[in-house]
UniProtKB/Swiss-Prot annotation:
Residues 405-428 have a biased composition (Polar residues). This is Casein kinase 1-like protein 2. It catalyses: L-seryl-[protein] + ATP = O-phospho-L-seryl-[protein] + ADP + H(+); L-threonyl-[protein] + ATP = O-phospho-L-threonyl-[protein] + ADP + H(+). It comes from Arabidopsis thaliana. The lineage of its organism: Eukaryota, Viridiplantae, Streptophyta, Embryophyta, Tracheophyta. The gene is CKL2. GO terms for molecular function: ATP binding; protein serine kinase activity; protein serine/threonine kinase activity.
Length: 465
C-alpha cells in the first residue's frame, strides 16, 4: 500500500533533507495537486515544525506566503504539508553565473521589502533573511517572490503592540554572512535587522560575493568572529562603491533606526523605484534567468529548418560547450538544504550579466511598479518536479554558541553556495537578438507579437537544478 499522509496526500520521492527533517514531493489524491511534505522525527532534540506551522497560519493570506495544507502527526513523524514552489533566489543566482543585473535586483528588492514588511505587520521578525529563504512561485505565479522558513522567527511585540525590551549579550541567531552589525555585536534583533540583512543580500546579488566570504579560521566560532570583524571594518561606502548611491542610502537609513523604531518601508521602496525609473527600466518581470533560460532553450531545441542557412559550424548559434566549474561563494558557505536533494543542472552563461543591466526599455506608466503583479513572462519558467522547491526549510548545519530561551532554538548557520558549469552562447545570434528586442520593445505588448512569442516558447524545458 502506498504511503499516505493525513489520509489525503500521497508521499512521493525525496526532494530535500537535513538535520531538521526530510522533504518529499507529495500529491493530493483527490485533486492531483502536487505539494511539499516535510517530515520531522518526533524524537528530534529541537523540534520546530509545530512552531513553524503556527507561524505560517498566522501569515496565511499574505502575498508571497505559501499556504499550509495540513499539519499533524503520522507515526513517528511530525508532518507539514505546504505549497510546492519554484527555485530559490540562491539557485537562480547560481544559474545566472553568480551575478545579477541591476534591473533584476531592483525588481526583487521591491517584492522582498514587501514580504518583510508583511511579516513585521504580523508582529514577527524573520531573523534569517538570505537568498535560500526566498523562492519563486510556479506557473502563473512564477514571477512572484515567496518568503519561507520561519523556524527562527520571533514575536517582537505583544497584542498591545508593546515592543520587546532591548537586550545585549545575545547569541548570534541566523546566517552569519547576512547578519546585521548589531546582531554580531550581541544586540537583540528588531525590525531594522531584517532590513539590514536584506541590504547584504542585495549587494551579494550585485557584486557576486561579500567581502567577508572565504575567511579562514580554526573553528566555526573563530570564523564567525572574523566575519564580524571584517563586517565592522567595512564601511558602507566601501561595500557599495561602484554601485548607485541608493544602496548606501538604504544601509545608512537602516543603521539610523533605533531599536524599537518602525521602519519607513515606503521610503525604502521609493529609493529603489526612483532608481529603477531613472535607469529607464521597464517593470516587466523579465528577470536575468528569464532571458538566459530562453537562450538556453534555443541551443537545446534549435528552430525548425528553413530554406536558408542551417545551424552548424558557421552558424551564429555555437554548440553548447561545458567549461570548468564556477568557484563557490566562499568557505564559510554551507550547501543549501535544498541542494542536497535536488540535482543541479549546468547553468548557461549567455553573456555578462552586467550587459543585461544596460538593456533599457521604455519606462512603463503601468502601476505595476508599485504592486507584485504577475505578468505573462511567467511562461518562460515552466518548472517541473525536479526544479520545484518546497516552501519549508530542510536543514541547518548549525553551531549553537551558548543557550537562549527563545522558542525557535537560535543558531548560527553558514550561508549556502553552489557551483555550476557555464555554457557560452553568442549574444548576437539572430534568434536570441530578435527575441530580446521583442522583450524590450514597446510593441511586445501587442497581441500578435505575444502570440507569436509564446508560440516560440511552447515546449521549452523548465529550469533544472
Amino acid at each position: 500500500m502506498e504511503p499516505r499522509v493525513g489520509n489525503k496526500f500521497r508521499l512521493g520521492r525525496k526532494i530535500g533533507g537535513g538535520s531538521f527533517g526530510e522533504i518529499y514531493l507529495g500529491t493530493n489524491i483527490q485533486t492531483n495537486e502536487e505539494v511539499a511534505i516535510k517530515l520531522e522525527n518526533v524524537k528530534t532534540k529541537h523540534p520546530q515544525l509545530l512552531y513553524e506551522s503556527k507561524l505560517y497560519k498566522v501569515l496565511q493570506g499574505g502575498t508571497g506566503v505559501p499556504n499550509v495544507k495540513w499539519y499533524g502527526v503520522e507515526g513517528d513523524y511530525n508532518v507539514l504539508v505546504i505549497d510546492l514552489l519554484g527555485p530559490s533566489l540562491e539557485d537562480l543566482f547560481n544559474f545566472c553565473s553568480r551575478k545579477l543585473s541591476l534591473k533584476t535586483v531592483l525588481m526583487l528588492a521591491d517584492q522582498m521589502i514587501n514580504r518583510i514588511e508583511f511579516v513585521h505587520q504580523k508582529s514577527f521578525l524573520h531573523r534569517d533573511i538570505k537568498p535560500d529563504n526566498f523562492l519563486m512561485g510556479l506557473g502563473r505565479r512564477a514571477n512572484q517572490v515567496y518568503v519561507i522558513d520561519f523556524g527562527l522567527a520571533k514575536k517582537y511585540r505583544d497584542s498591545n503592540h508593546q515592543h520587546i525590551p532591548y537586550r545585549e549579550n545575545k547569541n548570534l541567531t541566523g546566517t552569519a554572512r547576512y547578519a546585521s552589525m548589531n546582531t554580531h555585536l550581541g544586540i537583540e534583533q528588531s525590525r531594522r535587522d531584517d532590513l539590514e540583512s536584506l541590504g547584504f543580500v542585495l549587494m551579494y546579488f550585485l557584486k557576486g560575493s561579500l567581502p567577508w566570504q572565504g575567511l579562514k579560521a580554526g573553528n566555526k566560532k573563530q570564523k564567525y568572529e572574523k566575519i564580524s570583524e571584517k563586517k565592522v571594518s567595512t564601511s558602507i561606502e566601501a561595500l557599495c562603491r561602484g554601485y548607485p548611491s541608493e544602496f548606501a542610502s538604504y544601509f545608512h537609513y537602516c543603521r539610523s533606526l533605533r531599536f524599537d523604531d518602525k521602519p519607513d518601508y515606503a521610503y525604502l521602496k521609493r529609493l529603489f523605484r526612483d532608481l529603477f525609473i531613472r535607469e529607464g527600466f521597464q517593470f516587466d518581470y523579465v528577470f536575468d534567468w528569464t532571458i538566459l533560460k530562453y537562450q538556453q532553450s534555443q541551443i537545446s531545441t534549435p528552430p525548425p529548418r528553413h530554406h536558408g542557412p542551417v545551424v552548424g559550424p558557421s552558424s551564429a548559434l555555437p554548440p553548447a560547450i561545458t567549461s570548468a566549474e564556477r568557484p563557490s561563494g566562499g568557505d564559510e558557505a554551507r550547501p543549501s538544504g535544498w541542494s542536497s536533494g535536488i540535482p543541479r543542472r549546468n547553468s548557461g552563461q549567455i553573456f555578462n550579466s552586467g550587459s543585461l543591466a544596460k538593456q533599457k526599455a521604455p519606462v512603463s506608466s503601468d502601476p505595476a511598479i508599485s504592486k507584485d503583479v504577475v505578468l505573462s513572462s511567467s511562461s518562460f519558467l515552466r518548472a517541473t518536479g525536479s526544479s520545484r522547491r518546497a516552501a519549508v526549510s530542510s536543514s541547518r548545519e548549525a553551531a549553537v554558541l551558548g543557550t537562549d530561551s527563545e522558542p525557535s532554538n537560535p543558531q548560527i548557520v553558514e550561508a549556502g553556495s553552489g557551483s555550476n558549469s557555464k555554457i557560452p552562447v553568442s549574444r548576437n545570434s539572430p534568434i536570441v537578438s530578435s527575441e530580446i528586442n521583442k522583450l524590450s520593445s514597446p510593441s511586445r505588448a501587442t497581441t500578435s507579437v505575444m502570440k507569436n512569442y509564446e508560440a516560440n516558447l511552447k515546449g521549452i524545458e523548465s529550469l533544472h537544478f
